[in-house]
Amino acid sequence: SFYLFAPKPWQKNSPYKGINYLLGLVYWLSQLPAYYIIKYFADLVFVTSQPDVKPFITKNRKKNKITVVRGGVDTSPAKKYFEQGDFIPITNRHYDACFVGRLHYQKGVLELIHIWGTVCKKIPKSRLAIIGMGPLDGEIRSLIKQMGLQLNITLLGFLNGIEKFDVFKQSKIILHPATYDSGGMAPAEGMAWGLPGVSFDLEALKTYYPKGILKTKCFDLDAFASNILYLLSNPDAHLTLSQEASNLIRDYWDWDQQAQNIFHQVIKP
């Protein structure tokens, strides 16, 4: 299994810049032995997205011996919620957007604070919920204070189950500002609850999320904010993307469906 290529620290989109360059270099170098062992000695390789297939094709391993394992979502809580028909109207929801993920450079969380600052210039009372923990927690808190966004951004820490679902129910959009990703499963959770997404147009996300998410030119923070504002101010566009999001996750991301797909790829007739 090989689920994330370490970013080359000298690449433009590498999250390991400045004082973190050495850390990124060590990370990249440490992964090379595993990559070559898997590439030349494994009978079957699991990767997380379609762009990662090609690096493992060799003269002895064809494409059919490389399986994309995308991950999945338990869609049953959202399905039950929709069947009840008692959901919160968009205009009454507490959060304008939410983020779920590790507070790490790769996830674009520092960029997210600047993006939300731009959103607040147009909608001063807009609110963002951030779910997750990670090494950038302190830096994020300082940046929020520095930008005067204490009333606009709520850090909720780690949430799971009902607590996390309650945030989805109270949100209008899910944001995925990752600057480096091999697929990105976090937004799928919110999309299962009918939340349209906004992300950067990363290569891996093209096959993961062909619909349900507004893709933004990498790494244009103003354009990202504009996509958020577009969804918040256009009910018809929000509804269309919301339906696309929930349908995509229901049809392609449900765990039972994913398990069947993987089984048929690995245990071929």
Residues covered by each model-derived region:
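Membrane-proximal helix-turn-helix segments that form the acceptor-binding/catalytic region
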Residues: 21-45
